[in-house]
UniProtKB/Swiss-Prot annotation:
GO terms for molecular function: ferrous iron binding; manganese ion binding; mannonate dehydratase activity. PANTHER family: MANNONATE DEHYDRATASE. Pathway: Carbohydrate metabolism; pentose and glucuronate interconversion. Pfam families: UxuA. Belongs to the mannonate dehydratase family. InterPro entries: Man_deHydtase (IPR004628), Xyl_isomerase-like_sf (IPR036237). Keywords: Iron, Lyase, Manganese. Its EC number is 4.2.1.8. The keyword Manganese applies. This is Mannonate dehydratase. The lineage of its organism: Bacteria, Pseudomonadati, Bacteroidota, Bacteroidia, Bacteroidales. One of its GO terms (biological process) is D-glucuronate catabolic process. Transmembrane segments: none annotated.
Amino acid sequence: MTLLKDKLFLSEQTWRWYGPDDPVSLWDIKQAGATGIVNALHHIPNGEVWTVEEIMKRKELIESVGLKWSVVESVPVHEHIKTQTGNFRKYIENYKESLRNLGQCGIHIVTYNFMPVLDWTRTDLAYTLPDGSKALRFERAAFIAFDLFLLKRPGAETEYTDEEKTKARIRFEQMDEKEKQLLVRNMIAGLPGSEESFTLEQFQHELDRYRGIDAEKLRTHLIYFLKEITSTADEAGVKLVIHPDDPPCSILGLPRIMSCAEDFQALIDAVPNESNGLCLCTGSLGVSCANDLEGMMRRFGDRINFVHFRSTQRDAEGNFYEANHLEGDVDMYHVMKAFLELQQRRKVSIPMRPDHGHQMVDDLKKKTNPGYSCIGRLRGLAELRGLEMGIAKSIF
């Protein structure tokens, strides 16, 4: 809890850390001014129980430098749960046990997502900006080229317009073999925090698991999952926060069910338990111009227990890249203002983190996790901290 003038609640500033193998150290994070860590036990296979022993080992490591493990991101939802096949009931029981153990260890916010197969999707992990820094980018023509001519997904050609297919073929013909292989790696090799990586054949096999599962059916599976685990979360004092789809549109024929305000509302209506909460990610949701981020912050404020601040710059072709945190299409001032007012109304400091950052300055010479280099996020956190404080000083 953060107080200013004894009454004002400011956000808890957190930072995503990928564990002991992360090139950004806990001491780096402490020097950036963050106080909370967003972390997961990536070494534990999807579906297995997070034991108290493993949780405490990581928690004590974080606390050894004076930081706090504030948020879990994420306890992965096994694909069998999403498809309701195989051992999905056992995996749900394991998930419940992990929630109990996290609550017992004093960790009370757990992020998850219900995106099939892919966590988040970009075609370029090192897009060079005019200032020389590098960002993550989604190029629609390259994405469609991957789908049609590299993956060769059955039925894919029916999902795109003739104009899109023509642009994709032209784009594909411009690629040399090295660029094609890089595109494949970017699409399916798995990003930081992704627990699975695939060959093209394995990847298609994973996509095939979702044949016959449309958005309505996937939503039914999500609601079933939440109805099974929310009572456990309530008892453990754990808030579940679902991360929205990234990007918020259909990918490779896979259904998307957490892309807009209507999706959020449907989930809350179906599972009203207090533990059923939201992670508001301005970067993911902001890719769609139809999403009113300030309005969503106000409408769903009682359910928002974690915030990712990120901005994207989109164009009319369906492309976007990750912009600086205070630039791009997200009106960060008004979103932050709504966030600050939300915290005053609820009288609570809500964890937020700078979501992604440009690879810049010294980090350009280093091997970094895409989107998770140190200096770009340090800049983002400083800008967001200053914006929040400036708004707070001016209106409270």
